[in-house]
């Protein structure tokens, strides 16, 4: 495994592999790797000749009052995880390398970037789309692996890839959860033991909603979850919305495949989660 810290060097290495006929898989991360990331790495190692894991805490996707400075950066542990899981290259660029002072180009995926998390984290998805586009170009990846926990992010990246004709194929990967149901996230480390216990009600409520969705109307499903989330001590809901799986538009009575997406504060920690919901065929 090699550590690469320069974008030009990483691109040259990737192009050499492409020339040799190798297929490249990219797992973009901000570090603080957990079992969710490891599942993405495993898929790339299985599918691709070369696996690149990028570790870059991207400043342009954080708002002015967000957690950029305190975001966990366990670099040594992350490197060990990558090595243990057969990663070929860990790409760890500096902020100045990715976004020098004269950087002026940003990517916006209109409409999709402005709803759900985008309504609360202004310019967040502009930062995400821009850094992912750069990583696609630097890595020359044939495939890139993204977890479905960040479902809105996944849809934005899919749309960007389609609209801008990127050669990189987006591979959606299932949410990885702890045994108790909590969706794995690097920000879970912010939670106290009590906060973690309280947060379990999020995934539990969504799981019950998926069952209700099969036969109950949307308003019932949505209100039931909101009421449950409100009862979590110390919680504050940013949003709890049922949207179409394909385009994130609000679901209606004709929707057969939906996603219930939520963002909830537990104390000072903002957690997102979602669940896919499918109507019974006879409903």
Swiss-Prot record:
Any one GO biological process: pantothenate biosynthetic process
Binding site for (R)-pantoate: 61, 153
Chain residues that bind ATP: 30-37, 147-150, 176, 184-187
Enzyme class: ligase
Pathway(s) the chain acts in: Cofactor biosynthesis; (R)-pantothenate biosynthesis; (R)-pantothenate from (R)-pantoate and beta-alanine: step 1/1
The keyword ATP-binding is assigned to this record: yes
Subcellular location: Cytoplasm
Reactions the enzyme catalyzes: (R)-pantoate + beta-alanine + ATP = (R)-pantothenate + AMP + diphosphate + H(+)
UniProt GO MF annotations: ATP binding; pantoate-beta-alanine ligase activity
Sorted UniProt keywords: ATP-binding, Cytoplasm, Ligase, Nucleotide-binding, Pantothenate biosynthesis
SUPFAM superfamilies per record: Nucleotidylyl transferase
EC assignment: 6.3.2.1
InterPro entries documented for this protein: Pantoate_ligase (IPR003721), Pantoate_ligase_C (IPR042176), Rossmann-like_a/b/a_fold (IPR014729)
Entry annotation: catalytic residues: 37
Pfam families (alphabetical): Pantoate_ligase
GO CC annotations on file: cytosol
Binding positions (beta-alanine): 61
Miscellaneous field: The reaction proceeds by a bi uni uni bi ping pong mechanism.
PANTHER family membership: CYTIDYLATE KINASE/PANTOATE-BETA-ALANINE LIGASE (PTHR21299), PANTOATE--BETA-ALANINE LIGASE (PTHR21299:SF1)
Function: Catalyzes the condensation of pantoate with beta-alanine in an ATP-dependent reaction via a pantoyl-adenylate intermediate.
Similarity comment text for this entry: Belongs to the pantothenate synthetase family.
Quaternary assembly: Homodimer.
Name assigned to this protein: Pantothenate synthetase
Organism: Endomicrobium trichonymphae
Phylogenetic classification of the source organism: Bacteria, Pseudomonadati, Elusimicrobiota, Endomicrobiia, Endomicrobiales
Primary gene name: panC
């Amino acid at each position: 495994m090699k550590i690469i810290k320069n974008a030009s060097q990483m691109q040259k290495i990737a192009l050499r592999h492409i020339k040799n006929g190798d297929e490249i898989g990219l797992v973009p991360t901000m570090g603080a790797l957990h079992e969710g990331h490891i599942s993405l790495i495993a898929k790339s190692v299985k599918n691709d000749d070369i696996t690149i894991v990028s570790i870059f805490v991207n400043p342009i996707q954080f708002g002015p009052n967000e957690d950029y400075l305190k975001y966990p950066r366990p670099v040594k542990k992350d490197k060990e995880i990558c090595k243990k899981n057969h990663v070929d290259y860990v790409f760890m660029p500096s902020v100045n390398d990715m976004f020098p002072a004269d950087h002026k180009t940003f990517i916006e995926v209109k409409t999709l970037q402005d709803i759900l998390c985008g309504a609360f984290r202004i310019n967040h998805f502009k930062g995400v789309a821009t850094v992912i586009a750069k990583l696609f170009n630097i890595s020359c990846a044939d495939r890139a692996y993204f977890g479905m926990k960040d479902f809105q992010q996944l849809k934005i990246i899919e749309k960007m890839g389609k609209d801008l004709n990127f050669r990189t194929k987006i591979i959606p990967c299932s949410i990885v959860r702890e045994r108790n149901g909590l969706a794995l996230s690097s920000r879970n480390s912010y939670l106290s033991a009590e906060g973690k216990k309280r947060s379990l009600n999020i995934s539990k409520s969504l799981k019950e909603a998926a069952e209700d969705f099969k036969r109950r109307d949307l308003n019932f499903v949505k209100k039931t979850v909101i009421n449950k989330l409100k009862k979590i001590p110390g919680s504050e809901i940013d949003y709890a919305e049922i949207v179409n799986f394909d385009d994130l538009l609000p679901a209606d009575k004709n929707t057969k495949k939906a996603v219930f997406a939520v963002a909830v504060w537990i104390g000072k920690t903002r957690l997102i989660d979602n669940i896919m919901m499918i109507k019974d065929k006879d409903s």
